[in-house]
């Protein structure tokens, strides 16, 4: 059958995926740790260190080794947004999963979870979107602007992302997300947003693995990915992350781990299924890589994007229809 997908992320995507409606209320019992344990895999994160809050660009590589319906593999969760890839719950008629890329930027100020509550002057303003990219407002986990596109990544692929911040006068900044498309062999624009400059620098920086299906059954499926290299651009110099910290959410399930992946030379995160803890890398511990990774030569195309001039700001770029293109889905 033909189906259209609402352009949803976070809580809204989980509701579409069959999770209980109670999860839309952050004060509901759904979010009690004991109930989280029954409904979902534990969310696990890996922070890229040392801390470089003033960096103005961030390049990450992630390899997904194992996925499941309703999975989010964030390549970079910076202070005011995130970029990564997802496997949706639905499949195409031939049984292959629907997979997408996502880039979101939060509004500069906290306006709760209602995307319509933020004053227009405080909203992230869409400047430009890439081909095949859909854009809209989001809520439910703070508020801001989101962009998504069909992106047929595979297990074992090297997923490459880039986020760039540029000052836009004294009061604003532009934040732009790109993803490398292996089919075109080019960096492709996800979207660019203009936000109030309450801070400078992308800040933060971590990857995570999340089960957003949260329907009880999804916790029995393993999700695993390796994160790195991670480079931050500080004062004109690319600096690699050299230490990594594992964290988790409030879910008490401990079938999670972080361990060194010698094939990639970086740490992997895993959650769900029959995963067992790694006693050599426990939650909230920080570790350096056990062996020196190969030097990363920054793609000249990446440097060109980092050094590109500001985009012209006119009127708000109109959002796309908040639905996916028609896809040939299973009945």
Where are these regions (language model features)?
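Carbohydrate-binding surfaces in secreted/extracellular proteins
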Residues: 153-188
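Short, aromatic/His-centered strand-loop micro-motif at the edge of beta-sheets
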Residues: 138-158
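Bacterial N-terminal signal peptides
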Residues: 9-15
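Activation corresponds to long, low-complexity, non-globular regions
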Residues: 26-70, 205-209, 214-331
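Secretory/extracellular carbohydrate-interaction modules
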Residues: 25-132, 305-307
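Bacterial N-terminal signal peptides that target proteins for export
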Residues: 1-8
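Short, basic/aromatic beta-hairpin or loop at an interaction surface
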Residues: 130-140
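N-terminal signal peptide c-region/cleavage motif recognized by signal peptidases
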Residues: 17-19
